Amino acid sequence: MARLTKRRQADTKAIQHLWAAIEIIRNQKQIANIDRITKYMSRVHGMHPKETTRQLSLAVKDGLIVETLTVGCKGSKAGIEQEGYWLPGDEIDWETETHDWYCFECHLPGEVLICDLCFRVYHSKCLSDEFRLRDSSSHWQCPVCRSIKKKHSNKQEMGTYLRFIVSRMKERAIDLNKKGKDSKHPMYRRLVHSAVDVPTIQEKVNEGKYRSYEEFKADAQLLLHNTVIFYGADSEQADIARMLYKDTCHELDELQLCKNCFYLSNARPDNWFCYPCIPNHELVWAKMKGFGFWPAKVMQKEDNQVDVRFFGHHHQRAWIPSENIQDITVNVHRLHVKRSMGWKKACDELELHQRFLREGRFWKSKNEDRGEEEAESSISSTSNEQLKVTQEPRAKKGRRNQSVEPKKEEPEPETEAVSSSQEIPTMPQPIERVSVSTQTKKLSASSPRMLHRSTQTTSDGVCQSMCHDKYTKIFNDFKDRMKSDHKRETERVVREALEKLRSEMEEEKRQAVNKAVASLQGDMDRKGKQLKEKCKEEFVEEIKKLAAQHKQLISQTKKKQWCYNCEEEAMYHCCWNTSYCSIKCQQEHWHAEHKRTCRRKR
């Protein structure tokens, strides 16, 4: 059942200041009473004594500071019982602390509404109308739990996208870790209920623990929540965490806008902007203020504004008024554009994108391309084998025709018989005997030889043409494969050379930096040593001067006589070791004791 309750009341930043005050006072072996804490807070943090007293009482109620009665053992309050304050222990009863202590939206204490499914709490004023509690007897779910409950995505696909976002978060988190304190601070868990950091988020992404994008976004918001609580809303760490959360929300919005664009813009394969998305983006001519019309993709439309991403080198985004948008089918000459090199490159990229659209060509990974190449090569080899098998029966059929019709004098059957014999070069002699024997019945012995030679020449030409086409095709296929292999090998060699060159440059840079640092350190050490010796010499000289002055002053002091009563310089001599500065001192000392011990002759 949902209920409103006060989990905490004291300000988190004031609590940390009070903790520091108590710790410093205790380290000085003193009782951390209200007076000492108030003076410290006023001197260091400029907090008014009344505000210090109020925050201290709230912290005691919240259990963040322990109040005890302590008896003073020294000073003006020795033996007096007084209130003393201590830091709480490290032990926390997590069975009772099931929910956070501060509003997940504004990160402040006060009367909060507790979620029935998670640890989050909210102020009623921080909730929108749709999430506010309608009936106190009903169960209440926070906005985060409701958003997580709405969607469930493919975990494998979601993990791929979230890895890109986490890599961006790690870059920002470097600054956050540099500016922040260690999360292992002894009082950290007293303020932060559910600790989370970027490495934890990355680990959950790698293990596939997120069920939706909203759950991932909730962890990013939790990181901001913890940072604001521990470091303060106006701290530099909180500004970095807000920027980190804002960037994460922007990345998630871009992902929901178009998953294909999000993946390709992060993976960055060759010609990544040219591959079509599903569904396809509308292509337009867009005109920014101060520029001409430029080819672009429409990402989204809102009221009278169009969000476009331009073709070209940088692929920039911009919101363009709808009146500055023209359909891509509009003739370029009507747009009066300045055809610069950048504009031409953008148009070339547009043409490649349109060609990919016509061909239905979508981006595929290298493994898929390699599988397709292997399939194509196996299909081509199978087709070549089938071509050979179909040619052999044709040759046998030619021989059969030749033996059935041996008496015909037309050149076609003989040409067919000879060409068939050229297709099967292992049996030339039987064909030649058959042709000669058939021709001897009608012609002389010389005629068959001439006819055979002519048909042999004709068949050679036909066979040569067929073989030329066949091997030209095979050679072209082999040439294309060699080109692709050479291109991949060249890219690999260039990539390895670049990596090697980069590593060598980094090594040289590191050595140069180390050398410069060592040289600078040597100069600093040498100058520091010289300065130290100079200061030591000056110190010795100064000590000598002071010693001489001191000796001279002592000598001058010894040569003077001093009043026995008030120790001022004496003017009146009484006896061998007694003098006075005035008659008053002489009378006071005389009546007090000197009249009994004076050795002056009367």
Swiss-Prot record:
Transport among keywords? no
Q: Where is this region: Disordered?
A: 366-461
Q: Where does Zn(2+) bind?
A: 258, 261, 277, 281
Q: Which modifications occur after translation, per UniProt? A: Ubiquitinated, leading to proteasomal degradation.
Composition bias of kind Polar residues appears in: 435-461
- What does the annotation give as the result of altering residue 251 to A? Impaired H3.3K36me3 binding
A GO CC annotation given for this chain: nucleoplasm
Q: For the Bromo domain, which residue ranges apply?
A: 149-255
Q: Which residues carry this modification: Phosphoserine?
A: 421
Q: What is this protein called?
A: Zinc finger MYND domain-containing protein 11
Q: How does it assemble?
A: Homooligomer; forms homooligomers via its C-terminus. Interacts with histone H3.3 trimethylated at 'Lys-36' (H3.3K36me3). Interacts (via MYND-type zinc finger) with NCOR1. Interacts (via MYND-type zinc finger) with MGA protein (via PXLXP motif). Interacts (via MYND-type zinc finger) with EZH2. Interacts with EMSY and E2F6. Interacts with PIAS1 and UBE2I.
Residues annotated as binding Zn(2+) 1 are 563, 566, 581, 585
Give the organism the record lists.
Mus musculus
According to its UniProt entry, the protein's GO biological process terms are: defense response to virus; negative regulation of canonical NF-kappaB signal transduction; negative regulation of extrinsic apoptotic signaling pathway; negative regulation of JNK cascade; regulation of transcription elongation by RNA polymerase II
Give its localization: Nucleus; Chromosome
Q: List the disulfide bonds.
A: none
**Entry's PANTHER family?**
ZINC FINGER MYND DOMAIN-CONTAINING (PTHR46379), ZINC FINGER MYND DOMAIN-CONTAINING PROTEIN 11 (PTHR46379:SF1)
Per the entry, what this protein does is: Chromatin reader that specifically recognizes and binds histone H3.3 trimethylated at 'Lys-36' (H3.3K36me3) and regulates RNA polymerase II elongation. Does not bind other histone H3 subtypes (H3.1 or H3.2). Colocalizes with highly expressed genes and functions as a transcription corepressor by modulating RNA polymerase II at the elongation stage. Binds non-specifically to dsDNA. Acts as a tumor-suppressor by repressing a transcriptional program essential for tumor cell growth.
The gene from which this protein is expressed is: Zmynd11
What positions does the record give for the motif labelled Nuclear localization signal?
394-400
